[in-house]
Regions:
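Mg2+-dependent prenyl diphosphate-binding active-site environment of isoprenoid biosynthetic enzymes
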Residues: 4-146
Length: 146
């Protein structure tokens, strides 16, 4: 069985085939391995890994020198996520992962604007890094301890 990492890497390569010379896309192999250790639908694993990849890619775009191409690639990755989400056709999961995206963006904004207490910064970063897989796994696995 092909890993979620390998499947997504192939899909991204196909999506970006017409984009000349772009920075490498980092896919979180460890997250893929965690997702692959659970019996959840492949498209749910791909959706989770894709939104993680898109968000990390956009986070890596330098703030002072926003590359139009880097932003375009982030947008293409986000569009790929929404395509997978539509194919999955699970409105309940769609609502949960969409709410997770909103929460992650709000937390990132709070950090950026120094609105998080120093005592809460570690917890906030852990939430940002782990929320997508937690939402995905908890949605599909009834008795999971995350």
């Amino acid at each position: 069985m092909e890993s979620t990492y390998t499947i997504l890497k192939k899909q991204i390569t196909q999506r970006l085939a017409d984009v000349p010379l772009h920075q490498p896309i980092h896919i979180n192999r460890a997250l893929s391995d965690v997702l692959d250790s659970y019996d959840i639908p492949e498209k749910a694993k791909l959706a989770c890994l894709t939104i993680d990849t898109a968000m990390c890619h956009l986070d890596a775009v330098p703030g002072d020198h926003l590359s139009k191409q880097s932003i375009l690639i982030g947008d293409l990755l986000s569009a790929h996520f929404y395509t997978i989400l539509a194919e999955l056709n699970n409105p309940s999961y769609q609502a949960k992962i969409s709410q997770a995206i909103v929460e992650v963006n709000e937390l990132k904004s709070s950090i950026h604007h120094n609105q998080i207490d120093k005592q809460q910064i570690e917890k906030t970063i852990l939430t940002i890094e782990c929320l997508f897989p937690i939402v995905t796994i908890q949605h599909y696995i009834a008795d999971v301890n995350t």
